[in-house]
């Protein structure tokens, strides 16, 4: 009953915290500050975004094999009958309407953008899934992951902006390939699962208050780990729970490396990392938190430096940013302060939205309920070993064992509320972990 009441209390408080920022629209700085419409710049002829090859991890990913009508993977394709999209279908087989679900979702979003940008004009698809071998070897058209598009009026002066709208709609790679069309493609469904969520690999380490280090995957409620307050001062913070925990996950991580000192941090695209302002030489992180996917060489992250027995945070220049696929699991630890030192690099505990302070306030009800339960629930004794289990652990983990696998219910609640209240541009497209199909 106590846990049920706590959940109801959390839901009410979380909703109120998120609704208030969404409704506030007055002047000044704060959660309710209006976002100015983004100025859209047309793509130049032969430009592609992102600026990497199409079939790399940073774009739509590798080719996975041709899909035919007789293959087992044909069921991965779904027809698109959106009346706001014109399909050329010159083969007269309906093949151009077939595509993966991800491609369909992005195409439907783009169709709305096109009608908003040019009233009376629709999106036109000239090529979708190809079963006849008309494209180059290993083309993503053979998997239903690519489309070639124009506007219905075939006004070529619009194509640069059409490409930009495709980028904004969420296509994973957009190329102003020809003066006659724009080429767009998406990741494979299993690749999306590998890139989604906001986590660290299980092999990452944290520093414990009692000394030494511990693997992230081995953290338990009651552990106190090295973190930082909002002024950049190092301290030890209570580990509360995992916001996401997947032991068997195979994920694509961004590898952020510094040289002086030499440190390396792995985290998923949607996780937040603190970056120092250009004019800052001190240890205070301030409000600058970026998605890992936006961190670039030359920017500075915060690392632990030890000088004469004094340990403090200092900015260190990022030397390289690469991608690596690992099968070490995926873990998103939450501390009471909302920050954590992973592999000696300061990171946020949050992901999905690029506002650390928003996220930390949204978790205030969870922290409060955790503290109340820890105070109300007495530490219980583990009959097997004779030792006592901390109250915080017995309150939050029903079995007194390792934290529950999967995405934490409170994270899912906030995510769903956020999708109702926040602009889609506020949320990272790979923010919430998805299961591979």
From Swiss-Prot:
The record marks 271 as: Essential for auto-cleavage. The record marks 198-199 as: Cleavage. Keywords: Autocatalytic cleavage, Calcium, Cell membrane, Developmental protein, Endoplasmic reticulum, Glycoprotein, Golgi apparatus, Hydrolase, Lipoprotein, Membrane, Metal-binding, Palmitate, Protease, Signal, Transferase, Zinc. Ca(2+) 2 binds at residues 91, 127, 130, 132. One of its GO terms (cellular component) is membrane raft. Ca(2+) 1 binds at residues 90-91, 96, 126-127. Pfam families: HH_signal, Hint. Changing residue 118 to G: Causes a failure of Shh processing leading to retention of the immature glycosylated protein within the endoplasmic reticulum of transfected cells; causes a temperature-dependent conformational change that allows Shh to bind Ptch1 at 4 or 32 degrees Celsius but not at 37 degrees Celsius; drastically reduces signaling potency in chicken embryo neural plate explant assays. Zn(2+) binds at residues 141, 148, 183. The record marks 244 as: Involved in cholesterol transfer. Changing residue 101 to H: Does not affect signaling activity in any of Shh signaling assays and causes no apparent defects in cholesterol-mediated autoprocessing reactions. Changing residue 118 to R: Causes a failure of Shh processing leading to retention of the immature glycosylated protein within the endoplasmic reticulum of transfected cells; causes a temperature-dependent conformational change that allows Shh to bind Ptch1 at 4 or 32 degrees Celsius but not at 37 degrees Celsius; drastically reduces signaling potency in chicken embryo neural plate explant assays. InterPro entries: Hedgehog, Hedgehog_Hint, Hedgehog_sig/DD-Pept_Zn-bd_sf, Hedgehog_Signaling, Hedgehog_signalling_dom, Hint_dom_C, Hint_dom_N, Hint_dom_sf. A motif (Cardin-Weintraub) lies at residues 33-39. Induction: By retinoic acid. GO terms for molecular function: calcium ion binding; cholesterol-protein transferase activity; glycosaminoglycan binding; laminin-1 binding; patched binding; peptidase activity; zinc ion binding. Expressed in a number of embryonic tissues including the notochord, ventral neural tube, floor plate, lung bud, zone of polarizing activity and posterior distal mesenchyme of limbs. In the adult, expressed in lung and neural retina. A lipid is attached at residue 198 (Cholesterol glycine ester). A lipid is attached at residue 25 (N-palmitoyl cysteine). The keyword Cell membrane applies. Its EC number is 3.1.-.-. Residues 1-24 form the signal peptide. Interacts with HHATL/GUP1 which negatively regulates HHAT-mediated palmitoylation of the SHH N-terminus. Interacts with BOC and CDON. Interacts with HHIP. Interacts with DISP1 via its cholesterol anchor. Interacts with SCUBE2. Interacts with glypican GPC3. Belongs to the hedgehog family. PANTHER family: HEDGEHOG (PTHR11889), SONIC HEDGEHOG PROTEIN (PTHR11889:SF36). This is Sonic hedgehog protein. The gene is Shh.
């Amino acid at each position: 009953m106590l846990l049920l009441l706590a959940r109801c209390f959390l839901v009410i408080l979380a909703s109120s915290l998120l609704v208030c920022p969404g409704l506030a629209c007055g002047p000044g700085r704060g959660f309710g500050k209006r976002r100015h419409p983004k100025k859209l710049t047309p793509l130049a002829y032969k430009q592609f975004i992102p600026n990497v090859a199409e079939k790399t991890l940073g774009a739509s990913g590798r080719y996975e094999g041709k899909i035919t009508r007789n293959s087992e993977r044909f069921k991965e394709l779904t027809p698109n009958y959106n009346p706001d999209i014109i399909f050329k279908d010159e083969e007269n087989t309906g093949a151009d309407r077939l595509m993966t679900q991800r491609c369909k979702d992005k195409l439907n979003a783009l169709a709305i953008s096109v009608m908003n940008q040019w009233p009376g004009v629709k999106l036109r698809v000239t090529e979708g899934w190809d079963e006849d071998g008309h494209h180059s070897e290993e083309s993503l058209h053979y998997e239903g992951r690519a489309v070639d598009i124009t506007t219905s009026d075939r006004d070529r002066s619009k194509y640069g902006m059409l490409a930009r709208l495709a980028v904004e709609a969420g296509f994973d790679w957009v190329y102003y390939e020809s003066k006659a069309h724009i080429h767009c493609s998406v990741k494979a469904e299993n690749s999306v699962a590998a890139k989604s969520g906001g986590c660290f690999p299980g092999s990452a380490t944290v520093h414990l208050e009692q000394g030494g280090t511990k693997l992230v995957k081995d953290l338990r409620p009651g552990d106190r780990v090295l973190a930082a307050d909002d002024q950049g001062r190092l301290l030890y913070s209570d580990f509360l729970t995992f916001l996401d925990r997947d032991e068997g996950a195979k994920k694509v991580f961004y590898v952020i490396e510094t040289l002086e000192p030499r440190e390396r941090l792995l985290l998923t695209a949607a996780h937040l990392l603190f970056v120092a302002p250009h004019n800052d030489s001190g240890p205070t992180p301030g409000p600058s938190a970026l998605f890992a996917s936006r961190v670039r060489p030359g920017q500075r992250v915060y690392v632990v430096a030890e000088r004469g027995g004094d340990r403090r945070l200092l900015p260190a220049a990022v030397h390289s940013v690469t991608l690596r696929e690992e099968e070490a699991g995926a873990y998103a630890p939450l501390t009471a302060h909302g920050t954590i030192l992973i592999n000696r690099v300061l990171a946020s505990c949050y992901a999905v939205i690029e506002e650390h302070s928003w996220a930390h306030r949204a978790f205030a009800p969870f922290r409060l309920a955790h503290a109340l339960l820890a105070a109300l629930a007495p530490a219980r004794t583990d009959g097997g070993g004779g030792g006592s289990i901390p109250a915080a652990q017995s309150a939050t983990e029903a079995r007194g064992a390792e934290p529950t696998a999967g995405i934490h219910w409170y994270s899912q609640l906030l995510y769903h509320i956020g999708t109702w209240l926040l602009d889609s541009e506020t949320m990272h497209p790979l923010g919430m972990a998805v299961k591979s199909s």
